[in-house]
Amino acid sequence: MKLTIAKSAGYCFGVKRAVNMVYQEAEEAKVPVYTYGPIIHNEEVVRDLKQRGVHVVRELKELENLPKGKIIIRSHGISRREHEAMKACGFEVLDATCPFVLKIHRLVEKYSKEGYRIVIAGNEHHPEVEGILGWVEDRKST
């Protein structure tokens, strides 16, 4: 049997960028390093990062009891409210949101402010969809 691996096999560039950012911070940071949610849906990578001292924060309220440090936003992105809450807690926020996802955030923010209704096809509980919806001013549908 012949096995052929597609040229595009592996992580997209946004995920690679986010994972590389966390590994770099884990090696260089002089303060605690956290990720908001697992940086990637890959338990092996998450486990390796944990061994390097990176902790996963699953809810914003956890930040209140953690030593201040750097928190890295995963490639899925987050809502405006979450972003502001992280800064308000005194953490240095490093944004590893995929540039394509950031573009979507800016577009839904712009068009929702102009009165457009934003409709997103997807699982409303998926972190990327939650993040996108978090930049919609008012009217939205999923």
Region spans (language model):
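Conserved phosphate/oxyanion-binding catalytic-loop motifs
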Residues: 74-79
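Short internal beta-strands
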Residues: 32-39, 120-122
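Generic N-terminal amphipathic, Lys/Arg-enriched alpha-helix
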Residues: 1-10, 28, 32
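Conserved phosphate/anionic-ligand binding catalytic regions in large, soluble enzymes, centered on
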Residues: 8-22
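N-terminal beta-loop-helix "entrance" segment that forms/cooperates
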Residues: 37-54
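Short acidic low-complexity segments
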Residues: 56-66
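Ser/Thr/Gly-rich flexible loops in soluble cytosolic domains mediating phosphotransfer, phosphorylation
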Residues: 89-116, 120-124
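Conserved small/polar residues in nucleotide/adenosyl-binding loops
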Residues: 142
